[in-house]
């Protein structure tokens, strides 16, 4: 995966195998991109809340969600902040990106669409 292209558009319309959801570590998907994921993937949201309750979602730890339907997109949940009311920090983004680079091949990710990290509701 060495080709990076910047595109403007709706991440949910992406033709990529995997799409990235920017999340916090407290179990809230209340605005922006995360809210879009919560509405489209309610079963993932329920697991996310449970993982947060059990302190399994942390900065630098990525969670790949795959729906049982084979033709469905994969969602890479990427923590960009600890709490929804605090901004993202550059070191949080770097930790997540480093983990992505280290693990995308073993996870089977062949193509991916990222939203802008740490901006809008994240910034």
Located regions from the model:
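Macrodomain-like recognition of ADP-ribose-binding/processing modules
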Residues: 1-123
């Amino acid at each position: 995966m060495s080709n990076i292209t910047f595109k403007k558009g709706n991440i949910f319309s992406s033709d990529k195998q995997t799409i990235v959801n920017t999340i916090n570590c407290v179990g809230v998907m209340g605005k922006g991109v995360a809210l879009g994921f919560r509405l489209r993937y309610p079963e993932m949201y329920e697991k996310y809340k449970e993982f947060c309750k059990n302190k399994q979602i942390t900065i630098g730890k990525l969670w790949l969600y795959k729906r049982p339907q084979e033709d469905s997109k994969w969602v890479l949940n990427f923590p960009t902040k600890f709490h929804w009311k605090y901004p993202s920090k550059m070191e949080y983004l770097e930790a997540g990106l480093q983990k992505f680079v280290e693990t995308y091949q073993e996870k089977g990710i062949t193509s991916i669409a990222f939203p802008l990290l740490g901006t809008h509701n994240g910034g």
